[in-house]
């Protein structure tokens, strides 16, 4: 099992859902505000904002919160956020990419570096691990959206590149630059997605044992709890046996 989506599910089952939900809304709002500030405040005229709003809706973010985040971009006192990417190695030599939106680069860099160091890893230079990943668009649908065959048909028609259907849902991937168009066509066929975003997909995987898997989980958790961190990606691969033990 590659990546860390299953680990996030494990963590959520162990509690803190409300706190995590609030933090997710805060990060979604920040992305909406930044997108609105960089372009037009109308999602129809701003591809990045349209995706941000679609993703917020998919996460059940209240409409008022979305509108407030858009309006905030036109205010005189709106914070200036920089988009920053950090790269490094976590436990077991696992490559990790961290994306952040921050109004204080020094604070965020210090927090991210501390998280890597505490886990036994090390923060590297930009480009030190991203060559092991490929930037793509990812659209997630819940299982009820359709059968594996119907999802595949819709994805092919929309111009997607790959589909993975499992018990937990359907993952549709496409070229990074086509995410807006593909997600729009899929919405017309399947309804609103559960998640729409660009992701770093690992092209090289690092197998890990149970001990290293737990260490990576702690690192990812620490990073994702930082208000400035938007996304975390890692190239670890864990066996189904270990995953089952962690899920117990």
From Swiss-Prot:
UniProt keyword annotation of Cytoplasm present: yes
Keywords, comma-separated and alphabetical: Cytoplasm, DNA-binding, Transcription, Transcription regulation
Name used for this protein in its record: Probable transcriptional regulatory protein BQ11790
GO cellular component: cytosol
Pfam families tied to this protein: TACO1_YebC_N (PF20772), Transcrip_reg (PF01709)
Compartment(s) where it occurs, according to its Swiss-Prot or TrEMBL record: Cytoplasm
Recorded family membership: Belongs to the TACO1 family.
This protein's record includes keyword Metal-binding: no
Example GO BP: regulation of DNA-templated transcription
């Amino acid at each position: 099992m590659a990546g860390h989506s299953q680990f996030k599910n494990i963590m959520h089952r162990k509690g803190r859902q409300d706190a995590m939900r609030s933090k997710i809304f805060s990060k979604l709002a920040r992305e909406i505000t930044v997108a609105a500030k960089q372009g037009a405040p109308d999602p129809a005229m701003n591809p990045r904002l349209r995706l941000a709003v679609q993703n917020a809706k998919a996460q059940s973010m209240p409409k008022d919160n979305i509108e407030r985040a858009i309006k905030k971009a036109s205010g005189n006192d709106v914070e200036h956020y920089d988009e920053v990417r950090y790269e490094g190695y976590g436990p077991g030599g696992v490559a990790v990419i961290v994306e952040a939106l921050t109004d204080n680069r020094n604070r965020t860099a210090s927090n991210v570096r501390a998280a890597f160091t505490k886990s036994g890893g090390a923060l590297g230079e930009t480009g030190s691990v991203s060559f092991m990943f490929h930037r793509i668009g990812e659209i997630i649908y819940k299982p009820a959206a359709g059968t594996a065959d119907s999802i595949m048909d819709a994805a092919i028609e929309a111009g997607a590149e790959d589909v993975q259907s499992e018990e937990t849902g359907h993952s549709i991937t496409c070229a990074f630059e086509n995410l807006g168009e593909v997600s729009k066509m899929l919405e017309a066929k399947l309804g609103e997605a559960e998640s729409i975003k660009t992701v770093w997909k690992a092209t090289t995987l690092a197998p890990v044992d149970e001990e290293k898997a737990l260490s990576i989980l702690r690192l990812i958790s620490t990073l994702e709890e930082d208000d400035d961190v938007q996304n975390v990606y890692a190239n670890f691969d864990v066996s189904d046996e270990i995953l089952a033990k962690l899920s117990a």
